[in-house]
Amino acid sequence: MKKRTILWLMLAFFVLVLGACGQKTSQDKSDKTKGMKIVTSFYPVYAMVKEVSGDLNDVRMIQSSSGIHSFEPSANDIAAIYDADVFVYHSHTLESWAGSLDPSLQKSKVKVLEASEGMTLERVPGLEDMQAGEGIDEKTLYDPHTWLDPEKVAEEAQIIADKLSELDSANKDTYQKNAQNFSAKAHDLTKKYQPIFEKANQKTFVTQHTAFSYLAKRFGLNQLGIAGISPDQEPSPRQLTEIQEFVKTYKIKTIFTESNASSKVADTLVRSTGVSLKTLNPLEADPQNDKSYLENLEENLAILAQELK
């Protein structure tokens, strides 16, 4: 872990020096761009920053096509961050590489914003009693998937609006108004689906990993994750047996897989239990459609509501 941190810092230093050498070229490019140049870490953060910024700023993301859990920024990604006015990421809990870059970024012109700063994060299901230390990083004990709960999304959008308002006070009213409009739509989603899930006959759903804990808690549901907090993490044979028994005992009809993860484990359960497969989108990667963030989020709610009714 120390070697990886040192490597990131060395790479960051190299990019910083390279950026200084080409400062005139970067400045010429920035002059043609309206507002601030904002780089974001992955899709949910990008979508929220874009909603709050509207057309005021140039908002981009460095990760778009894969899950954020296994993402490592390339040299070009880091160069893009150092070329930005503002870098926004979700949390140290999720993007540990951002924490490695943070000290050197603080010495540059780039303003670094943690979008979930101040939010209350829940413990990862099953790790509530585990203590940090002896090789266990405290950050890994907390669930970062706040972007799948409409109310948490509204909270994070407001944090982003407040931070951008501090950096760009001339446009504070626009940031705040956009955040309020976005939050109102998020609240409407909660109001729409709360009574639907309250009437649902089935309250438990099985997912490929525990990405939907905040969503489940918000709507009074119970999530059983097949493979823990990461879609790349394989469950043990004992865990698979326990899940098979759970599915049969509670008459689970559907296992929800993810659009950006392997379905090998879920396929094994389908063969052994006879359940069907449906897809929920953890929204870690850009869905590559014309829908708004909240419209993509609502797709998950609609699929769950249909299966649990």
Language model features: what each stretch is:
Residues 20-309:
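Extracytoplasmic metal-acquisition and chelation regions
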Residues 2-25:
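Sec-dependent N-terminal signal peptides of Gram-positive bacterial secreted proteins and lipoproteins
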